Amino acid sequence: MKHNSVVVVSGGSGGIGKAIITRYLQKGFSVISIDLIDTFDVKNSNFFFLKGNVESEKSIRSLIKLIIKKHGRIDYFFSNAGILNVGDHNSSNSDWKKNFNVHLMSHVYISKILIPIFKKQKQGYFLITASAAGLLTHIDSLTYSVTKHATIAFAEWIAINNYNSNFQISVICPQAVRTNMTKGREKDVAALDGMLEPEVVVDKIEEAIYEKKFLILP
């Protein structure tokens, strides 16, 4: 990664997103966090918070345009927002809609404006956070499992159909990670062999970026 890279992270208020932001601020990059709340108590001229809702295409489009206007480009975009609802086939329609909006449509909205930018720049890296549940399953959450499978399918299609483009795409599929989302779930089946620390996940992400791996398996 270049020393003056512009990095954007959605879902940056905690967990993996916050660890990504912290890591790249330490490297001196310009980092923009997109989320509903700002949890960073830092005074760093390279950090910028933009309030936005990843479920809204209008919000995403306006924020990315704002970033381009201010910074001139985007080098790395981490599409990282996520939620977790416990439930089976009886999960409410609103839970299903929320999970699909956050875990699938947010990436769709971002890709619509980001990919043309990357093609114009002739470079860029689109990193999408999915989950090991998207490769296997999450015993306690049907909505999470199904929509994370959709996340991976989306990333695969984008990668295959842009194979000869000048930008890269990766999908991140970690096992259980110690975040606010998994707090109190240390005894869940997914965490029986322990939870990963967010910083460890970022280590694996950096290795994969260097090697240009599509599937990142922390």
Stretch-by-stretch model annotation:
Residues 171, 187-218:
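C-terminal helical subdomain
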Residues 131:
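Residue(s) in the substrate-gating loop at a strand-loop-helix junction
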Residues 13-14:
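Conserved glycine-rich cofactor-binding loop
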Residues 111, 147:
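Active-site helix of classical SDR
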Residues 83-97, 140-143:
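Conserved mid-core segment of classical short-chain dehydrogenase/reductases
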